[in-house]
Every structure is written in structure tokens, then in C-alpha cells.
Amino acid sequence: MGQKVNPVGLRIGVIRDWESKWFAGKDYADFLHEDLKIREFISKRLSDASVSKVEIERAANRVNITIHTAKPGMVIGKGGSEVEALRKALNSLTGKRVHINILEIKRADLDAQLVAENIARQLENRISFRRAQKQTIQRTMRAGAQGIKTMVSGRLGGADIARSEYYSEGTVPLHTLRADIDYATAEADTTYGKLGVKVWIYRGEVLPTKKNTAEGGK
């Protein structure tokens, strides 16, 4: 089962948290579509800023957005001009008060989303899919990963028949729920059509913290 299911979704509530943190009753569908709009808008506007994920929290008529990026300077802009323009654009998009936090990703080579997008950009620049995957794997392992697996699917090298090729190094224990596995996908637009990129990165085990419960009657 661990081989088929999304590794991030499988671990939510175990060692990972939700990326949208809010509760809603009858407004659930509206909030959900608003979240999708916000994420799509940010990914298009900050396509060159190495954005890994966007967390959204809601309280009354306020939306708190946390952007995880490897290039915070590009998101913030000179004197905060870019982030202020982004906040105003999101205000008008949602009709609510938007507050934006920027969190820097210290080690981009251990972030599956950024690694997948990096491979996709290399494929668009006509770099061999084998070379792109092998170089990326070496960089990620040097950065401290315990294992990585990458897969590229589509008309590889312009072949008539689409296929998938994957490379891996180290271990990627998909069944182990306490294993911190980051997973992401990306797409590369080439002259022969789209290529799909998938990346799994094993960053070590997350041991659950024991809660100290007072024993009754003692």
C-alpha cells in the first residue's frame, strides 16, 4: 500500500501537518476553492522564486499565508515592495484581510518540490534526463538525505513510445510511517510534449514525542 499512496497524505496526522489549517461548516467548499485560487495565483506569480509550499490559516475575516521559499529576497523585494504588492493582489482576489509570512528554506536540495522543479527545468533546457537525475541525486545525498528516488516519465529523448525511467540511491522506506519522506511532482514542457517528474526524498526518522500523563491514584 505504501508503494501506491501519496507518501505525504499517508503521514498527515502522524508526523506531518495539514497545509490548510482551518475549520468550516457550510462555507467549506468556498474556502477550499479559495485556497486553490490562492495557491495557483502564488505559484504563477512567484514561479522563479523557488516556492516549495504555501500554508493557509483562517480566522474570522482574516487569511494568514505562510510562503516557504528558497529565495526570500525575491519574494520580499526591495524594501518589501514585492510582498506588499502580492498582499494587495491577494486582498482583492479573496476580499479578505491577508497577512503574509515568508519562511526561508535553508537546504533546498532536501526539498522534494524544489528538486523536482529543478529536474523539470533541466529537461526543458534539453539536458539528458539521465544526467539531470544522476546529478540531482548526488547533490541531494551530499546535502544529508538518507535516500532519494527520482522518476521521469514521457517521451524520453524524443522516443515514439513513452516510458518511465527511475534512479535511486540510499533507502526510501515508504511503508514506515515514522520515516520523514518528502514527495513532489513537476512537469517539463519539451518540444516532444510533457514529461512528468516525481521525487521521493528520505530525510530520516521522526520519533514521536512521549506525552507525560499523570498516573491516577498515585
From Swiss-Prot:
The keyword Nucleotide-binding does not apply. The keyword Chloroplast does not apply. One of its GO terms (cellular component) is cytosolic small ribosomal subunit. Keywords: Ribonucleoprotein, Ribosomal protein, RNA-binding, rRNA-binding. InterPro entries: KH_dom, KH_dom-like_a/b, KH_dom_type_2, KH_sf_prok-type, Ribosomal_S3_C_sf, Ribosomal_uS3_bac-typ, Ribosomal_uS3_C, Ribosomal_uS3_CS. Residues 38-106 form the KH type-2 domain. GO terms for molecular function: mRNA binding; rRNA binding; structural constituent of ribosome. It comes from the Bacteria. SMART domains: KH (SM00322). HAMAP family: Ribosomal_uS3_B. NCBIfam families: rpsC_bact (TIGR01009). Part of the 30S ribosomal subunit. Forms a tight complex with proteins S10 and S14. PANTHER family: 30S/40S RIBOSOMAL PROTEIN S3, SMALL RIBOSOMAL SUBUNIT PROTEIN US3C. Binds the lower part of the 30S subunit head. Binds mRNA in the 70S ribosome, positioning it for translation. Belongs to the universal ribosomal protein uS3 family. This is Small ribosomal subunit protein uS3.
